[in-house]
């Protein structure tokens, strides 16, 4: 939860979905071309458009003709034809993230990780070789709200049909072999041991626990060292049966396919999944009380995290908050936080803020690392910057610059098939209008200073913050005075 999302992609608020689950494997054989190679060759053959050529204008944005329907089993499908490359991308987004773990934290991540570990007649190695031999890429991942399985394949009928057959088996009928289950559990347990040496992770876990209490978002997606060993294969099978049901998935498809071919693919995949309805949406969290916590950790630096409940994905203030946060701390250099904390005082390498809208109210967070002996003063400085921003709002120049950056980076949201399939998946998963991207852009460009200020004050309050620090308890020093050229640069390389 403490990782920062790149500001240019946060402009849509969906690009996290466009890239998660992207871990894939492939091995090309002599004389064969795989889907990723086809994409790389196409990119290499295109002339890059330089910033000089753009002459200050935003690059062209690719408008999407989104087609949508539902399969006989209840799966929602979103499809965009794209015939430029002989390939297609498919992403299945299940409401099967860790918020559905119930009393077994970690079961969602384990279930997803086990999908490609075995099917009837094939172990994990044979599955990998099967995709590789077809020039196809498989990817999967599980998070708070969702679990994902993805396929990239050449659109040639022979390769496509074989890849789809294997993909449908992997997603719909995994066997959950015991040896793989033990291996992945051990990997997760090793990860928990590593977390003990990561103050940023420890602070993040404590922060989410304080922020969400008994809500399903409180626990880490991968569970804990206590919960994971107790999870059984029977629990994985039961979770797969209900959470990977056809009624609980959105199928996003982009590529060199006709509507008829896309319908056939969606029907094939949907029919391979367990039969069942969508799972109920999780409840909204209860507003926590403001609090301050500290984790003692031997280090030269202190991790600082501030958070409060933000918004869900349906909030009408989404565009205004995205713009407001971009100016506060969502970008790199030039944001309010970065200017005051790093550029003028040299207290950190980076300080970032962000909303994470989810099915229920996700967190708004500010996080940074700073010298331990200046941690208290730095925390107060961050709080003062936020308070001042809420009181004054953005300047006209800040708002104009943020709008210009958004307009310039907006085309990246649909620059490739992988980008598009991620956008479609998010639109379908969060039940957004098909025109969401254009709507968001229009709303953002029309924002006024007053609207941004009002939205930020409506959803944020300096008296609501949950604060967690992780680092040593040491005598504190006063902060340096602000200057255009800080005499002391940030200490060393950021830890962890």
Question: Can you describe what each PLM-predicted range is?
Answer:
Residues 80, 85-113, 124-171, 185, ...:
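M16 family metallopeptidases and their MPP-like homologs
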């Amino acid at each position: 939860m403490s990782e920062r999302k790149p500001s240019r992609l946060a402009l849509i608020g969906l690009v996290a979905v466009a890239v998660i689950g992207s871990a894939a494997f492939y091995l090309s054989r002599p004389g064969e071309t795989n889907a990723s190679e086809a994409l790389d060759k196409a990119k290499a053959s295109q002339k890059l458009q330089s910033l000089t050529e753009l002459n200050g204008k935003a690059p062209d944005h690719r408008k999407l003709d989104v087609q949508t329907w539902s399969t006989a089993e209840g799966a929602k499908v979103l499809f965009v034809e794209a015939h430029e490359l002989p390939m297609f991308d498919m992403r299945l987004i299940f409401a099967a993230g860790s918020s559905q773990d119930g009393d077994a934290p970690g079961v969602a991540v384990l279930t997803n990780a086990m999908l490609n570990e075995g099917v009837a007649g094939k172990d994990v190695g044979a599955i990998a070789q099967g995709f590789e031999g077809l020039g196809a890429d498989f990817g999967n991942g599980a998070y708070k709200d969702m679990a994902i399985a993805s396929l990239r394949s050449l659109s040639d009928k022979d390769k496509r049909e074989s890849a789809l057959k294997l993909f449908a088996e992997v997603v719909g009928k995994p066997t959950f072999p015991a040896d793989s289950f033990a291996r992945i559990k051990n990997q997760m347990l090793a990860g928990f041991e590593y977390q003990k040496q990561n103050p940023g992770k420890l602070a993040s876990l404590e922060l989410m626990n304080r922020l969400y209490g008994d809500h399903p978002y409180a626990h880490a997606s991968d569970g804990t060292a206590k919960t994971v060993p107790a999870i059984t294969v029977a629990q994985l099978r039961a979770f797969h049966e209900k959470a990977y049901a056809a009624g609980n998935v959105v199928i996003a498809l982009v590529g060199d396919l006709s509507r008829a071919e896309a319908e056939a693919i969606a029907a094939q995949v949907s029919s391979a999944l367990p039969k069942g309805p969508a799972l109920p949406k999780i409840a909204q969290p209860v507003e926590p009380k403001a609090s301050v916590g500290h984790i003692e950790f031997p280090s030269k630096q202190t991790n600082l995290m501030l958070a409060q409940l933000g918004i869900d994905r349906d909030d009408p203030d989404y565009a205004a908050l995205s713009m407001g946060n971009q100016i506060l701390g969502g970008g790199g250099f030039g944001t309010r936080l970065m200017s005051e904390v790093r550029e003028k005082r040299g207290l950190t390498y980076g300080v970032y803020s962000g909303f994470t809208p989810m099915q229920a109210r996700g967190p708004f967070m500010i996080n940074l690392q700073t010298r331990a002996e200046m941690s208290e003063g730095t925390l107060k400085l961050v709080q003062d910057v936020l308070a001042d921003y809420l009181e004054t709002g953005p300047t006209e120049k800040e708002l104009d610059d943020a709008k210009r950056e958004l307009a310039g980076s907006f085309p990246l949201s649909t620059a490739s098939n992988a980008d598009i399939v991620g956008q479609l998946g998010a639109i379908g998963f969060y039940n957004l209008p098909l025109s969401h991207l254009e709507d968001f852009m229009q709303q953002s460009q029309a924002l006024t200073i007053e609207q941004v200020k009002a939205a930020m004050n409506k959803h944020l309050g300096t008296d609501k913050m949950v604060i967690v620090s992780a680092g040593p308890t040491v005598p504190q020093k006063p902060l340096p005075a602000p200057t255009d050229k800080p005499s002391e640069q940030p200490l060393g390389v950021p830890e962890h």
